[in-house]
Swiss-Prot record:
Transferase among keywords: no
Name of the protein: D-aspartate oxidase
Primary location recorded for the protein, binned into one broad class: other
Positions occupied by motif Microbody targeting signal: 368-370
Family, as annotated: Belongs to the DAMOX/DASOX family.
Gene3D superfamilies, per the entry: D-Amino Acid Oxidase, subunit A, domain 2, NAD(P)-binding Rossmann-like Domain
Positions of FAD binding: 15, 49-50, 54, 166, 317, 346, 348
Induction: Induced when grown on D-aspartate as sole nitrogen or carbon source. Not induced when grown on L-aspartate, D-glutamate or D-alanine as sole nitrogen source, or poor nitrogen sources such as L-proline or gamma-aminobutyrate (GABA).
One of the record's GO cellular component terms: peroxisomal matrix
Organism encoding this protein: Vanrija humicola
EC number: 1.4.3.1
Any single GO BP term: cellular detoxification
Length: 370
């Protein structure tokens, strides 16, 4: 393909921007255009999950899922190296992560690859009924900071950025308004559009895409510098069961969650869910309460925690039956690389799947699964 042929990346979430970075790094001077409805500096929108996500590196990869484990481990390595190089400047924060389970007596093997991995005595857990507990060093990400840094990187690498709605892949080659952005029909496109991919794929594939609604509460608690998660029930190779999580960020905000509601398109927070999340967060980490309230009765602690709420928000995880799709195909007269359907795993797998997507486009080895 001549360098002057446009290459389109659809989507400007963490999947689209990391894919664009790797594409531009591997092919300097490529004529890359990123088209998206939503951008990192926009107001929060449930359809743009990247800025609402908890955004910590915590793999859900089943022991038998080599592809997901590889993506997640590669992404951790990239993020950890970045944190060691620039610290918290791009929104990364290293911390001790404690994982607790009710009912289970083992952990995902992928955690053993993290620094400082330890199996802990569950009897020392801050809440009752814990049957297994581990800790390790991990990372959290302040999404708007990290996404802004990615946007700056793709600009510096020469990408052109456009706010544009793309109704179909064919429109990229036929719609005059779109063609005016990049002057000639594109020869290749990367579909990194999350749930927006429903409009860019045939009907049978579109039917496999669905939202998994997640509601979170963000509090201002700069004293928190450690992460905690409690899992009740099986992950089921993904995000099954009920999870309660506490995710501190380098800016002093802490994300409390959460919910996993498949097929629920409700974009606004439910107040009863806010109360439930605050109550569960106090169960797994009493120190999330403001210091002055820690000796108070539990209901009063919930009220105190509510007083430091910065916002509550809802995001739609871009889920896909059968898992993420990272594959090369042809459509509308173009080579198409699909990189979507990552559900709640986009942040922890972004660099790994971006590298696979670019390798597929370049004709190298990749993990295509149609």
């Amino acid at each position: 393909m001549p360098p002057s042929d446009p290459i389109i990346v659809l989507g400007a979430g963490v999947i689209g921007l990391t894919t664009a970075v790797r594409l531009l790094e591997a092919h300097l001077g490529a004529n890359v255009h990123i088209l998206a409805d939503h951008w990192p500096s926009d107001a929060l929108d449930a359809q743009y999950a990247s800025t609402i996500a908890g955004a910590h590196h915590l793999s859900f990869a089943d022991d038998g899922d080599a592809r997901q484990r590889r993506w997640d481990m590669r992404t951790f390595d990239v993020l950890y190296d970045e944190w060691k190089a620039v610290g918290e400047r791009t929104g990364l924060m290293a911390l001790t992560q404690t994982e607790m389970w009710e009912g289970a007596t083992s952990h995902l093997a992928v955690y053993e690859g993290n620094p400082d991995f330890r199996v802990l005595d569950p009897r020392t857990a801050p809440c009752s009924n814990i049957t297994h507990m581990v800790s390790f060093t991990s990372l959290t990400i302040a999404p708007t900071v990290y996404l802004a840094a990615l946007e700056a990187r793709v600009r510096d690498l020469g990408a052109k950025l456009h706010r544009a709605h793309v109704p179909s892949l064919g429109a990229l080659r036929t719609d005059p308004a779109l063609l005016a952005l990049y002057t000639r029909p594109p020869a290749a496109v990367f579909v990194c559009a999350g749930l927006g991919a429903r409009h860019l794929v045939p009907a049978p594939e579109a039917a496999a895409l669905f939202p998994t609604r997640g509601q979170v509460v963000v509090v201002r608690a700069p004293w928190m510098r450690a992460g905690f998660t409690r899992q009740v029930g099986s992950l089921g190779g993904g995000e099954g069961g009920t999870r309660t999580y506490i995710i501190p960020r380098c800016n002093g905000e802490v994300v409390l969650g959460g919910t996993m509601e498949q097929g629920d398109w409700t974009p606004y927070p439910r107040d009863e869910t806010v109360t439930d999340i605050l109550t569960r967060a106090l169960q797994i980490c009493p120190d999330i309460a403001p210091p002055y309230a820690r000796s108070w009765p539990k209901d009063d602690q919930v009220a105190a925690l509510r007083s430091i709420v910065v916002r509550d928000a809802v995001g739609f995880r871009p889920s896909r039956a059968g898992g993420a799709r990272v594959a090369l195909a042809s459509a509308a007269g173009m080579r198409v690389v699909y990189n979507y359907g990552h559900g709640g795993a986009g942040w922890q797998s972004c660099w790994g799947c971006a590298e696979d997507a670019v390798a597929l486009w370049a004709g190298g080895a990749g993990g295509a699964r149609l």
